[in-house]
Amino acid sequence: MSFSKTIQMFIFDGNPNGRIMCELSNWNGRVYKISRNELSEFSQRDDSENTGVYFLFGKNEENNDTVYIGEAERMFSRLKQHLKDSKYWNDCIAVISKDNLLNKAHAKYLENKFYLLAQNAGRSIVINSTIPTCSSISEYDEAMLQEFISNAKLLVNTLGYKVFDTVEDAVVRHNDMQSYFFIKAARGADAKGLIVSDGFAVMKGSAIASSIVPSMSDNLMKLRSSLIEKGIIDEDLKLTRDYIFTSPSLAAAVVMGRNANGRTEWKNEEHKTIKDIEES
């Protein structure tokens, strides 16, 4: 069961694209969003050298979202070292405890778990060269850190980074909208999907059409080709993992190999379209 949450957000310079601090009621964690260009200002915070984990966000040469996941005993000092790296990152999120209760073992544990969460979600390309080592910790500490992870994920998402969110996390929990929708169409198209908070998710194993029609738009053709090149669609034209499209129509078009209106093409087990449910 999900509960309502109260989030406190402090925008340091009145600029929503600048430095932001986020906290959650009754939680000792704190999350900072810092741009690369404003990292020096972070050093002025009393807790800037607290222990924690951090995430560096950027784009690769193909314009795909990337993330580097790290841990630090002294947060600002570690982040400053990354300024010497090539410009593979633009923004940073640092997660610390306000009372500095996290130790090195805690940070290593968090680094490993966030790495695995990001890999599982598949939202961004994780550019760590190795899998972070997971520390051995007590059952008490593990329970505490699992709650820490859950709260940190919520705040990272609130700041606009869905890097750790799986399809299950994003499913819209509202009446008929949380049921599966299906497409079974020409040229072998056979897919199922779900409405999620940031678009429409097509499930792993769904099959797309074996060919496309000549009238399919260039942008859709490029998207289909890109998904095949990245291995998200395999040689059998099936999705290798759950994949979130920005809209039901985009998802339907890739599945059917032609321009499509997703609000009328996707139907649930009762043969109701998304349009039917929205207007009922």
Task: Give the ranges of each region predicted by the language model.
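Polyanion-binding interface signature
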Residues: 172-265
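Short, solvent-exposed polar/charged micro-motifs at secondary-structure junctions
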Residues: 103-106, 248, 275-276
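GIY-YIG nuclease catalytic motif and its immediate N-terminal context
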Residues: 1-84, 101, 105, 109, ...
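Hydrophobic side chains in beta-strands
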Residues: 56, 72, 94-96, 204, ...
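Internal, well-ordered alpha/beta segment that forms a basic, Gly-enriched binding/recognition surface
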Residues: 90-150
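Short acidic beta-strand-loop surface patches of small beta-rich interaction domains
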Residues: 266-279
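Hydrophobic/aromatic-lined pockets within catalytic cores
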Residues: 84, 115, 119-123, 160, ...
